[in-house]
Curated annotation (Swiss-Prot):
It comes from the Bacteria. Forms part of the ribosomal stalk which helps the ribosome interact with GTP-bound translation factors. This is Large ribosomal subunit protein uL11. It comes from Bradyrhizobium diazoefficiens (strain JCM 10833 / BCRC 13528 / IAM 13628 / NBRC 14792 / USDA 110). Keywords: Methylation, Ribonucleoprotein, Ribosomal protein, RNA-binding, rRNA-binding. One or more lysine residues are methylated.
Length: 142
C-alpha cells in the first residue's frame, strides 16, 4: 500500500546552500520533518548546479513523517536576468527598458525550461519566455 500524503511544501532554495536556518528550518520543522536529512539530500543533488542558483523544490510530506522532493528548473526570471546581464527587471516594464535579450537566448532559455512549462512545442515555450521578458521590462531583439 502506498504511503498517505499529508501535504506538499513549495520552497525556493539556493543550489548547494540548503541549511537549517530560516526559511527552510521552520517550514520543515513545523511539519515534523528531519531538517538535516533534507538539507543533506538537497545539497547532494544540487552539487552540479551553479552555486546559489535558486532551485524551486516541491516536498511531498507523508503521514509517517517521511518525505520525498522534486526539483524543478530555476525560475525563468533568473535565466532572463543572466542572459540580459542585469540585477533586476524594470520598475516600470511598459515604459522603461531594463535590458535586451536576443531570439537565440530566448530559444536557449525555452529549451532549458521546456520540461517545466505547460506546452508542447519549442515555439510556444519561446512565446512564454518572451512574455516573461516583456513583463520584466526586457526588449526581445531579432
Amino acid at each position: 500500500m502506498a504511503k498517505k500524503v499529508t501535504g506538499y511544501l513549495k520552497l525556493q532554495v539556493p543550489a548547494g546552500a540548503a541549511n537549517p536556518s530560516p526559511p527552510i528550518g521552520p517550514a520543515l520543522g513545523q511539519r515534523g520533518l528531519n531538517i538535516m536529512e533534507f538539507c543533506k539530500a538537497f545539497n547532494a543533488q544540487t552539487q552540479k548546479e551553479e552555486k546559489n542558483t535558486p532551485i524551486p523544490v516541491i516536498i511531498t510530506i507523508y503521514a509517517d513523517r517521511s518525505f520525498t522532493f522534486e526539483m524543478k528548473t530555476p525560475p525563468m526570471s533568473y535565466f532572463l536576468k543572466q542572459a540580459a546581464k542585469i540585477q533586476s527587471g524594470s520598475k516600470a516594464p511598459g515604459r522603461d527598458k531594463a535590458g535586451k535579450v536576443t531570439k537565440a537566448q530566448v530559444r536557449e532559455i525555452a529549451e532549458k525550461k521546456m520540461k517545466d512549462l505547460n506546452c508542447d512545442t519549442i515555439e510556444s515555450a519561446m512565446k512564454m519566455v518572451e512574455g516573461s521578458a516583456r513583463s520584466m521590462g526586457l526588449e526581445v531583439a531579432g
